């Protein structure tokens, strides 16, 4: 539909449309450009704004129930846009009334790239939480690991995927053989996850 975004739910058994939610681009329930969604239920649908640091909660009628501004955290630090476009490797997680969203490496964290290949950055949180009751925003204590060894010719790449098993968050980083497992984003346990079938030489990976 021109001028609208549609979220369509299908019934797997009947192969028919179960619910169609229209989000206009203008008006009180609008988002000018969506950046993915996460459905906790048909009456609790979280939609991300592509151009603003905001997540909106919609009901099945396409009405905004609430909105969450995450422009800055409680200490005044800027956040990056939380994208909900990729459901399989960066899903939104809602736990104990808090929204857990991904954070890319902070633009303010980059320090230097002496050779144009090895990018160095200060500690950068991997996630941020939004308390749906108080709307307080906090960065996680868990930060990106030292992704690349110096003088190896690796390009900067913050590619990371995450799953949540109902208790633990499990992170997998591009070009790293360990899985990072955490329950609270404060302490982390590493598990080796080398492939049994591939012996990939990482040096010289193209940018």
PLM segments and residue spans:
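Short beta-strand elements that form the blades of beta-propeller/WD-repeat-like
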Residues: 1-3, 43-50, 97-108, 162-174, ...
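Beta-propeller blade signature
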Residues: 7-10, 62, 116-133
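Beta-propeller fold detector
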Residues: 17-24, 65-78, 137-145, 188-204
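Short, conserved, GDST-rich strand-edge loop motifs in beta-rich repeat architectures
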Residues: 102-122
């Amino acid at each position: 539909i021109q001028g609208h975004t549609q979220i369509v739910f299908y019934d797997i058994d009947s192969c028919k449309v179960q619910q169609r939610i229209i989000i206009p681009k203008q008006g009180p329930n609008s988002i000018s450009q969506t950046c993915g969604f996460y459905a906790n239920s048909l009456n609790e649908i979280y939609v991300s704004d592509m151009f603003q640091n905001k997540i909106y909660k919609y009901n099945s009628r396409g009405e905004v129930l609430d909105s969450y501004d995450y422009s800055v955290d409680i200490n005044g630090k800027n956040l990056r846009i939380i994208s909900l476009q990729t459901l399989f490797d960066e899903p939104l997680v809602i736990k104990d009334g808090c929204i857990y969203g991904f954070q890319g490496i902070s633009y303010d964290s980059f320090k230097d790239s002496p050779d144009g290949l090895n990018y160095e950055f200060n500690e950068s949180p991997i996630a941020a939480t939004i308390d749906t009751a108080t709307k307080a925003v906090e960065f996680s204590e868990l930060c990106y690991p030292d992704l690349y060894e110096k003088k190896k010719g690796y390009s900067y790449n913050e590619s990371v995927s995450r799953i949540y098993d109902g208790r633990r968050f499990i992170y997998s980083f591009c070009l790293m053989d360990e899985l990072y497992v955490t329950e609270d984003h404060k302490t982390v346990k590493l598990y080796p996850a080398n492939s049994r079938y591939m012996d990939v030489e990482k040096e010289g990976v193209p940018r």
